[in-house]
Protein backbone atom coordinates (compact mmCIF):
# COMPACT_ATOMS: atom_id res chain seq x y z
CA UNK A 1 0.00 0.00 0.00
CA UNK A 2 1.17 3.51 -0.79
CA UNK A 3 -0.16 7.05 -0.64
CA UNK A 4 -0.98 9.76 -3.15
CA UNK A 5 -2.18 13.37 -3.17
CA UNK A 6 -4.74 12.86 -5.94
CA UNK A 7 -8.45 12.70 -5.17
CA UNK A 8 -9.72 9.24 -4.15
CA UNK A 9 -11.38 7.06 -6.75
CA UNK A 10 -13.49 5.26 -4.16
CA UNK A 11 -15.16 7.16 -1.34
CA UNK A 12 -16.42 5.60 1.87
CA UNK A 13 -19.90 6.73 2.84
CA UNK A 14 -22.82 5.74 5.05
CA UNK A 15 -24.28 3.92 2.06
CA UNK A 16 -20.98 2.12 1.35
CA UNK A 17 -18.96 1.83 4.59
CA UNK A 18 -16.68 -0.86 3.15
CA UNK A 19 -15.16 -2.00 -0.12
CA UNK A 20 -13.45 -5.34 -0.65
CA UNK A 21 -10.14 -5.24 -2.54
CA UNK A 22 -9.18 -8.47 -4.30
CA UNK A 23 -5.57 -9.07 -5.36
CA UNK A 24 -5.80 -10.66 -8.79
CA UNK A 25 -2.35 -12.29 -8.65
CA UNK A 26 -2.21 -13.06 -4.94
CA UNK A 27 -5.81 -14.13 -4.13
CA UNK A 28 -5.60 -11.77 -1.16
CA UNK A 29 -8.64 -9.97 0.22
CA UNK A 30 -8.50 -6.65 2.04
CA UNK A 31 -11.31 -4.56 3.45
CA UNK A 32 -11.09 -0.80 2.85
CA UNK A 33 -12.86 1.51 5.29
CA UNK A 34 -11.22 4.79 4.22
CA UNK A 35 -11.19 6.61 0.88
CA UNK A 36 -8.63 5.21 -1.56
CA UNK A 37 -7.25 5.00 -5.10
CA UNK A 38 -6.04 1.94 -6.98
CA UNK A 39 -3.28 1.20 -9.46
CA UNK A 40 -3.49 -2.20 -11.11
CA UNK A 41 -3.84 -5.95 -10.56
CA UNK A 42 -6.74 -5.54 -8.12
CA UNK A 43 -10.51 -5.79 -8.35
CA UNK A 44 -12.69 -3.48 -6.27
CA UNK A 45 -15.82 -5.20 -4.98
CA UNK A 46 -18.81 -3.28 -3.64
CA UNK A 47 -21.02 -5.26 -1.23
CA UNK A 48 -24.61 -5.60 -2.44
CA UNK A 49 -25.86 -4.79 1.05
CA UNK A 50 -24.52 -3.20 4.21
CA UNK A 51 -22.67 -6.10 5.78
CA UNK A 52 -20.94 -5.54 9.10
CA UNK A 53 -17.17 -5.80 9.22
CA UNK A 54 -17.37 -9.19 10.94
CA UNK A 55 -19.79 -10.51 8.34
CA UNK A 56 -17.44 -9.43 5.56
CA UNK A 57 -14.49 -11.10 7.28
CA UNK A 58 -16.44 -14.36 7.52
CA UNK A 59 -17.56 -14.22 3.88
CA UNK A 60 -14.16 -13.45 2.35
CA UNK A 61 -12.45 -16.07 4.56
CA UNK A 62 -14.81 -18.71 3.20
CA UNK A 63 -14.45 -17.31 -0.31
CA UNK A 64 -10.65 -17.42 -0.37
CA UNK A 65 -10.62 -21.07 0.69
CA UNK A 66 -12.44 -21.94 -2.52
CA UNK A 67 -10.06 -20.15 -4.91
CA UNK A 68 -7.47 -22.48 -6.43
CA UNK A 69 -3.92 -21.08 -6.27
CA UNK A 70 -2.59 -20.66 -9.82
CA UNK A 71 0.65 -19.01 -8.76
CA UNK A 72 1.27 -15.59 -10.29
CA UNK A 73 -1.59 -16.02 -12.79
CA UNK A 74 -4.72 -13.89 -12.57
CA UNK A 75 -7.41 -15.35 -10.33
CA UNK A 76 -10.51 -13.18 -10.72
CA UNK A 77 -12.00 -15.34 -13.50
CA UNK A 78 -11.84 -18.25 -11.04
CA UNK A 79 -12.83 -16.31 -7.93
CA UNK A 80 -16.05 -14.90 -9.36
CA UNK A 81 -17.32 -18.41 -10.16
CA UNK A 82 -16.57 -19.88 -6.74
CA UNK A 83 -19.50 -21.13 -4.67
CA UNK A 84 -18.98 -20.71 -0.94
CA UNK A 85 -20.48 -22.33 2.14
CA UNK A 86 -22.26 -19.99 4.58
CA UNK A 87 -24.29 -20.79 7.70
CA UNK A 88 -28.07 -20.64 7.31
CA UNK A 89 -31.08 -20.48 9.60
CA UNK A 90 -34.66 -21.03 8.47
CA UNK A 91 -33.46 -21.05 4.87
CA UNK A 92 -31.69 -17.69 5.10
CA UNK A 93 -28.04 -16.72 5.60
CA UNK A 94 -27.38 -16.65 9.34
CA UNK A 95 -25.58 -13.33 9.70
CA UNK A 96 -26.02 -13.39 13.47
CA UNK A 97 -24.02 -16.61 13.71
CA UNK A 98 -21.30 -15.22 11.42
CA UNK A 99 -20.97 -12.10 13.56
CA UNK A 100 -20.84 -14.13 16.78
CA UNK A 101 -18.27 -16.54 15.30
CA UNK A 102 -15.86 -13.77 14.28
CA UNK A 103 -16.43 -11.96 17.59
CA UNK A 104 -15.48 -15.12 19.50
CA UNK A 105 -12.33 -15.53 17.39
CA UNK A 106 -11.42 -11.88 18.01
CA UNK A 107 -11.78 -12.33 21.76
CA UNK A 108 -9.67 -15.50 21.67
CA UNK A 109 -6.90 -13.77 19.69
CA UNK A 110 -6.97 -10.77 22.02
CA UNK A 111 -6.51 -13.06 25.03
CA UNK A 112 -3.61 -14.78 23.26
CA UNK A 113 -2.08 -11.41 22.37
CA UNK A 114 -2.41 -10.19 25.93
CA UNK A 115 -0.78 -13.36 27.27
CA UNK A 116 2.07 -13.05 24.75
CA UNK A 117 2.69 -9.40 25.63
CA UNK A 118 2.82 -10.29 29.32
CA UNK A 119 5.13 -13.30 28.94
CA UNK A 120 7.49 -11.43 26.58
CA UNK A 121 7.60 -8.38 28.83
CA UNK A 122 6.17 -6.14 26.10
CA UNK A 123 3.11 -5.17 28.14
CA UNK A 124 5.20 -2.49 29.85
CA UNK A 125 5.39 0.50 27.51
CA UNK A 126 6.41 3.09 30.10
CA UNK A 127 9.87 4.49 29.38
CA UNK A 128 12.51 4.47 32.08
CA UNK A 129 14.56 7.61 32.64
CA UNK A 130 17.51 5.96 30.89
CA UNK A 131 15.37 5.06 27.87
CA UNK A 132 14.01 8.61 27.68
CA UNK A 133 17.56 9.93 27.74
CA UNK A 134 18.56 7.61 24.90
CA UNK A 135 15.60 8.78 22.79
CA UNK A 136 16.26 12.44 23.59
CA UNK A 137 19.61 12.18 21.87
CA UNK A 138 17.80 11.36 18.64
CA UNK A 139 14.99 13.87 19.09
CA UNK A 140 17.40 16.79 18.88
CA UNK A 141 17.95 18.67 15.59
CA UNK A 142 19.99 16.79 13.00
CA UNK A 143 23.03 19.05 13.41
CA UNK A 144 23.29 18.22 17.11
CA UNK A 145 23.10 14.43 16.80
CA UNK A 146 26.82 13.90 16.41
CA UNK A 147 27.36 15.98 19.53
CA UNK A 148 24.91 13.90 21.56
CA UNK A 149 26.12 10.47 20.42
CA UNK A 150 29.69 9.46 19.75
CA UNK A 151 30.02 7.16 16.75
CA UNK A 152 32.83 4.90 15.69
CA UNK A 153 33.46 3.07 12.42
CA UNK A 154 33.76 -0.71 12.64
CA UNK A 155 34.55 -3.28 9.96
CA UNK A 156 31.83 -5.94 9.73
CA UNK A 157 34.36 -8.78 9.47
CA UNK A 158 35.98 -7.69 12.74
CA UNK A 159 32.69 -8.07 14.60
CA UNK A 160 31.09 -11.17 13.04
CA UNK A 161 31.88 -14.62 11.72
CA UNK A 162 29.98 -16.39 8.96
CA UNK A 163 28.41 -19.70 9.95
CA UNK A 164 28.42 -22.62 7.53
CA UNK A 165 25.23 -24.39 8.54
CA UNK A 166 24.21 -27.35 6.43
CA UNK A 167 21.37 -29.72 5.62
CA UNK A 168 22.23 -32.95 7.43
CA UNK A 169 20.70 -35.51 5.07
CA UNK A 170 22.52 -36.72 1.96
CA UNK A 171 19.76 -35.62 -0.43
CA UNK A 172 17.30 -32.73 -0.25
CA UNK A 173 13.69 -32.93 -1.44
CA UNK A 174 11.88 -29.59 -1.35
CA UNK A 175 8.48 -31.28 -1.42
CA UNK A 176 9.09 -33.38 1.70
CA UNK A 177 11.93 -31.75 3.65
CA UNK A 178 10.46 -28.26 4.19
CA UNK A 179 7.08 -26.66 4.76
CA UNK A 180 5.69 -23.15 4.24
CA UNK A 181 3.68 -23.60 7.44
CA UNK A 182 5.24 -23.90 10.86
CA UNK A 183 4.12 -27.08 12.62
CA UNK A 184 5.31 -29.25 15.50
CA UNK A 185 7.24 -31.29 12.91
CA UNK A 186 8.54 -28.43 10.75
CA UNK A 187 9.51 -26.08 13.56
CA UNK A 188 12.87 -24.60 12.55
CA UNK A 189 12.78 -21.28 10.61
CA UNK A 190 14.92 -21.44 7.46
CA UNK A 191 16.43 -18.38 5.80
CA UNK A 192 16.50 -17.89 2.04
CA UNK A 193 16.08 -15.11 -0.56
CA UNK A 194 12.99 -13.71 1.12
CA UNK A 195 11.99 -10.03 1.22
CA UNK A 196 9.93 -9.31 4.33
CA UNK A 197 8.54 -11.64 7.01
CA UNK A 198 11.93 -11.43 8.73
CA UNK A 199 13.48 -13.38 5.88
CA UNK A 200 11.58 -16.59 6.65
CA UNK A 201 9.53 -18.43 4.03
CA UNK A 202 10.03 -22.09 4.96
CA UNK A 203 10.41 -24.29 8.02
CA UNK A 204 12.37 -27.52 8.45
CA UNK A 205 12.72 -30.39 10.88
CA UNK A 206 15.10 -29.80 13.76
CA UNK A 207 16.99 -33.03 13.10
CA UNK A 208 17.48 -32.22 9.40
CA UNK A 209 19.22 -28.84 9.64
CA UNK A 210 22.19 -27.49 11.54
CA UNK A 211 21.05 -24.44 13.48
CA UNK A 212 22.27 -21.46 15.46
CA UNK A 213 20.65 -18.73 17.56
CA UNK A 214 21.42 -15.04 18.19
CA UNK A 215 22.52 -14.55 14.59
CA UNK A 216 21.96 -12.07 11.75
CA UNK A 217 20.59 -13.18 8.39
CA UNK A 218 21.98 -11.59 5.20
CA UNK A 219 20.33 -12.33 1.85
CA UNK A 220 23.07 -12.61 -0.76
CA UNK A 221 20.86 -13.11 -3.82
CA UNK A 222 17.40 -12.15 -5.05
CA UNK A 223 15.72 -9.67 -7.39
CA UNK A 224 14.63 -7.35 -4.56
CA UNK A 225 15.83 -9.16 -1.46
CA UNK A 226 19.60 -8.93 -2.03
CA UNK A 227 21.35 -7.31 0.97
CA UNK A 228 18.24 -7.47 3.13
CA UNK A 229 19.28 -8.04 6.73
CA UNK A 230 17.21 -9.64 9.49
CA UNK A 231 17.89 -10.41 13.16
CA UNK A 232 17.37 -14.08 13.99
CA UNK A 233 17.54 -14.44 17.78
CA UNK A 234 15.70 -17.79 17.70
CA UNK A 235 17.17 -21.12 16.58
CA UNK A 236 17.45 -20.88 12.78
CA UNK A 237 18.74 -22.91 9.84
CA UNK A 238 19.88 -22.03 6.31
CA UNK A 239 18.05 -23.05 3.13
CA UNK A 240 19.65 -21.14 0.23
CA UNK A 241 20.58 -17.70 -1.14
CA UNK A 242 21.25 -16.34 2.35
CA UNK A 243 23.69 -16.88 5.20
CA UNK A 244 23.95 -16.31 8.94
CA UNK A 245 26.62 -14.31 10.71
CA UNK A 246 27.20 -14.43 14.45
CA UNK A 247 28.67 -11.70 16.66
CA UNK A 248 32.09 -12.45 18.12
CA UNK A 249 30.77 -11.17 21.47
CA UNK A 250 27.74 -11.88 23.63
CA UNK A 251 24.56 -10.02 22.65
CA UNK A 252 20.93 -9.90 23.69
CA UNK A 253 17.90 -9.34 21.46
CA UNK A 254 18.05 -5.54 21.63
CA UNK A 255 21.71 -5.37 20.61
CA UNK A 256 21.09 -7.89 17.82
CA UNK A 257 18.25 -5.70 16.47
CA UNK A 258 20.48 -2.62 16.54
CA UNK A 259 23.34 -4.37 14.76
CA UNK A 260 21.16 -5.85 12.02
CA UNK A 261 19.57 -2.47 11.33
CA UNK A 262 22.98 -0.82 11.13
CA UNK A 263 24.30 -3.44 8.71
CA UNK A 264 21.24 -3.12 6.49
CA UNK A 265 21.67 0.65 6.36
CA UNK A 266 25.29 0.19 5.34
CA UNK A 267 24.90 -2.44 2.60
CA UNK A 268 21.36 -2.37 1.19
CA UNK A 269 22.02 0.33 -1.41
CA UNK A 270 25.46 -1.03 -2.36
CA UNK A 271 24.41 -4.49 -3.48
CA UNK A 272 21.76 -5.88 -5.81
CA UNK A 273 20.85 -8.66 -8.20
CA UNK A 274 23.86 -7.89 -10.41
CA UNK A 275 26.17 -7.42 -7.42
CA UNK A 276 25.54 -10.17 -4.88
CA UNK A 277 25.94 -9.48 -1.17
CA UNK A 278 28.34 -12.36 -0.50
CA UNK A 279 30.26 -12.54 2.76
CA UNK A 280 33.63 -11.87 1.13
CA UNK A 281 32.30 -8.45 0.10
CA UNK A 282 30.09 -7.67 3.09
CA UNK A 283 32.77 -8.40 5.67
CA UNK A 284 34.88 -5.57 4.21
CA UNK A 285 32.08 -3.04 4.67
CA UNK A 286 32.05 -0.64 7.61
CA UNK A 287 29.20 0.24 9.95
CA UNK A 288 28.71 3.10 12.39
CA UNK A 289 28.18 2.14 16.04
CA UNK A 290 27.80 4.27 19.17
CA UNK A 291 30.93 4.41 21.31
CA UNK A 292 31.84 5.46 24.83
CA UNK A 293 35.38 5.94 26.07
CA UNK A 294 36.66 4.46 22.82
CA UNK A 295 34.64 1.25 23.08
CA UNK A 296 31.35 0.13 21.52
CA UNK A 297 28.54 1.42 23.72
CA UNK A 298 26.37 -1.68 24.02
CA UNK A 299 24.41 -0.20 26.92
CA UNK A 300 23.21 2.70 24.75
CA UNK A 301 22.25 0.34 21.92
CA UNK A 302 20.20 -1.77 24.31
CA UNK A 303 18.47 1.24 25.87
CA UNK A 304 17.61 2.79 22.51
CA UNK A 305 16.06 -0.38 21.06
CA UNK A 306 14.19 -1.06 24.30
CA UNK A 307 12.72 2.46 24.16
CA UNK A 308 11.75 2.11 20.50
CA UNK A 309 10.08 -1.24 21.23
CA UNK A 310 7.97 0.36 23.95
CA UNK A 311 6.92 3.22 21.69
CA UNK A 312 5.96 0.81 18.90
CA UNK A 313 4.09 -1.63 21.14
CA UNK A 314 2.24 1.02 23.18
CA UNK A 315 -0.77 1.27 20.85
CA UNK A 316 -0.97 -2.53 20.60
CA UNK A 317 -1.03 -2.87 24.40
CA UNK A 318 -3.66 -0.15 24.76
CA UNK A 319 -5.76 -1.76 22.02
CA UNK A 320 -5.56 -5.17 23.70
CA UNK A 321 -6.42 -3.67 27.09
CA UNK A 322 -9.41 -1.83 25.62
CA UNK A 323 -10.72 -4.98 23.92
CA UNK A 324 -10.23 -7.07 27.07
CA UNK A 325 -12.12 -4.53 29.19
CA UNK A 326 -14.93 -4.41 26.62
CA UNK A 327 -15.18 -8.19 26.67
CA UNK A 328 -15.28 -8.27 30.48
CA UNK A 329 -18.02 -5.63 30.44
CA UNK A 330 -20.14 -7.61 27.96
CA UNK A 331 -19.72 -10.82 29.98
CA UNK A 332 -20.63 -9.02 33.21
CA UNK A 333 -23.73 -7.42 31.67
CA UNK A 334 -24.90 -10.73 30.25
What are these regions (language model features)?
Residues 1, 89-197, 293-334:
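Non-catalytic DNA-recognition/assembly elements of restriction-modification systems
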Residues 1-83, 157-286:
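DNA target-recognition domains and sequence-specific DNA-contacting regions of bacterial/archaeal
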Residues 48-51, 87-92, 248-251, 291-295:
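A generic structural motif
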Residues 81-86, 284-292, 304-305, 309:
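An amphipathic, hydrophobic-aromatic interaction surface with interspersed Lys/Arg
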Amino acid sequence: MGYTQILPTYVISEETPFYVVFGDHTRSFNIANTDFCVMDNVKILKPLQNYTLRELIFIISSWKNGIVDKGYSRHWSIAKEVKIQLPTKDGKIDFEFMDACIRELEEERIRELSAYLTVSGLDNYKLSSEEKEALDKFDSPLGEKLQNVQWGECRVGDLFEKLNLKFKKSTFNKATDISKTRTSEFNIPLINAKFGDNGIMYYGRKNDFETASMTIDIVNDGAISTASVYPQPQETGVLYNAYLIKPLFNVNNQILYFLSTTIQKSIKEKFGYENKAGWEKVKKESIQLPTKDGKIDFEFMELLISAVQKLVIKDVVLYADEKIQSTKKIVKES
